[in-house]
Amino acid sequence: MYEKTRICECCGKELVYGSYTAWCWAEKNKTICKSCASKKRAKRLNDLTVLLEETPETYYWMGFLLADGHFDEKRIIVGLAEHDRDHLEKFAKYIDFEGTISLVKRGPYCSVRLSAMDTEVVKKLREKFDIKSNKTYNPPKTLNWIPEKLFLCFIAGLIDGDGNIMNFHKRKDVFIRIKQHKTWLPILEELGSYFGETGRVKINKQGYAELYITGYPKIRELKRKLLEYNIPLMPRKWGKIDLNLKTKYEKKAETYAEIEKLLRLGVKQTKIAKTVGVCESTVSKVKKLFIR
């Protein structure tokens, strides 16, 4: 039996021909294997390769997808509440999605859904970020390989996907909370370590792992940095963080610093109290604390 082979220029697969004529025709026309030909004919409805880039927005979306998306072997599926449709549309634009964003109704609730397929890219993403199909119970082993700048964007994506930014009771300052299955505890500890003492991790009474980020100056600085990276933060969450707001502790520290400055310049305590807008006992207290 006649048998001659050649290599597919696209994937490197060996192609076998049963006649010399067939081999000559294929060689002359530089034909490729059926699988590669099928992929070329298929219309691309998205470009997931952008999610392999080392950019702030890519890492933001990967954090978001790790929290709120689903990865199977071939595709990425994202479903959000209908009121967050604009955010899903931003993701669709980022991956050049040309398919349909579906509206899903379940009783009184409506959600929007997007499914983007690319077997090769999804495989690479799952390997790069250690993502399993049942990621709710099997999180990545570690995220500490991500550079700091991109790590912050990744955290922001997680917050927008599975976190909350909430006000303290009867206060204008906020705290951030991320709640996950208890198997996520090591990952939340990695995230919390970036924020030092203001990032606390615990297992709550229901058995979930929770990360709390407190300390308004740290949260305010986080938002400032993220705005520099021009990533698509959710306004309904990050809008709660007022960059001009100062806590009572910050205001107190500034007042004490101003009093100390005037004391060292030799200004009388009565005049300092009037200038700064405090009582003389406060000036005396600062003098005892800082002036030796």
Residue ranges and their predicted role:
Residues 2-292:
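Internal intein/HINT superfamily modules and their associated LAGLIDADG
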